[in-house]
């Protein structure tokens, strides 16, 4: 069931859709994922006359509007023309999966069709519409995190995701630095590994990681490193540091769940156990509510 590939930077994993009853660790404030701060721009009017995409009416002006908007949001592999091809439909499906908080490009509403006035149209017009981008690298002492996927693994390409995930990583890094690392400067930084492929979609290395809404975190050691080949059973595993890292992520409003098998941290409410998560944690986010112009339905 698990797909494994031997590699120098750690074991990849399958993160399935496991329901989680959220428990807040003691002292951690309650969050509301629907009101999370995200990067925004003015709401955009996208006056579609009909549907665009798979099986749509695909009027030329409508197609042009949708593709220009997707390109502006970072789906830059699309061509700015009026063609509806498989790349366009896949980009629409990826956008739909993201806005529904899915970890795979599948599920209800992921049909590759933008209906005028529908949910996908509404999200395209939203000021906080998801932007697709290269994940932040970090690595500086003030960042609190290091993205080894971007900085070190030049032969790998799981470097991409949503602006929402990028914000979550950088904010968690800042929180970890000020809340823990400043008092324990010899501790490892949060070490980020895989997010998603450059155009999202399925990857042979993961069951999820398709929508830029999750990333992996390496297990820290007591020597201040996180080389990627450490498990929670290793005598050098640093539980206190991992607790601080997971706490920083859980404090972020869009974080939906964290998968990691340390039974102590599971009992404390920082994470949920799932097979395959002894050697890394898997952090998932969900989507905020769309922010649209006043008067829009």
List each model region and its residues.
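Acidic, Ser/Thr/Pro/Gly-enriched interdomain connector segments
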Residues: 27-82
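Extracellular LysM carbohydrate-binding repeats and other cell-envelope/extracellular binding modules
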Residues: 86, 90, 94, 98-131
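Acidic helix-start/capping segments at beta-turn-to-alpha-helix junctions
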Residues: 83-91, 113-121, 185-204, 261-268
């Amino acid at each position: 069931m698990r797909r494994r590939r031997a590699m120098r930077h750690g074991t990849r994993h399958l993160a399935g859709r496991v329901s989680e009853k959220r428990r807040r660790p003691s002292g951690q404030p309650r969050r509301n994922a629907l009101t999370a701060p995200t990067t925004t721009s003015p709401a955009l009017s996208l006056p579609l006359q009909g549907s665009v995409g798979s099986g749509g009416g695909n009027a030329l002006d409508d197609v042009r509007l949708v593709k220009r908007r997707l390109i502006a949001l970072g789906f830059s592999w699309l061509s700015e023309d009026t063609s509806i091809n498989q790349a366009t439909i896949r980009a629409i499906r990826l956008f739909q999966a993201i806005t529904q908080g899915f970890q795979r490009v599948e599920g209800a509403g992921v049909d590759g069709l933008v209906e005028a006035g529908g949910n996908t149209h509404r999200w395209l017009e939203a000021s906080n519409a998801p932007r697709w981008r290269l994940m932040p690298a970090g690595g500086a002492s003030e960042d609190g995190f290091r993205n080894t996927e971007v900085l070190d693994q030049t032969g790998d390409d799981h470097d991409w995701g949503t602006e929402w995930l990028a914000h979550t990583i950088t904010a968690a890094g800042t929180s970890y630095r000020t809340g823990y690392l400043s008092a324990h400067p010899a501790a490892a930084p949060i070490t980020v590994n895989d997010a998603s492929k450059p155009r999202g979609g399925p990857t042979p290395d993961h069951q999820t990681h398709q929508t830029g809404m999750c990333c992996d975190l390496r297990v820290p050691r007591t020597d201040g490193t996180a080389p990627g080949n450490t498990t929670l059973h290793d005598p050098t595993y640093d539980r206190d540091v991992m607790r601080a890292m997971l706490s920083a992520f859980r404090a972020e409003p869009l974080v939906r769940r964290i998968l990691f098998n340390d039974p102590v941290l599971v009992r404390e409410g920082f994470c949920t156990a799932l097979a395959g998560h002894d050697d890394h944690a898997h952090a998932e986010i969900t989507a905020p509510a769309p922010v649209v112009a006043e008067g829009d339905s």
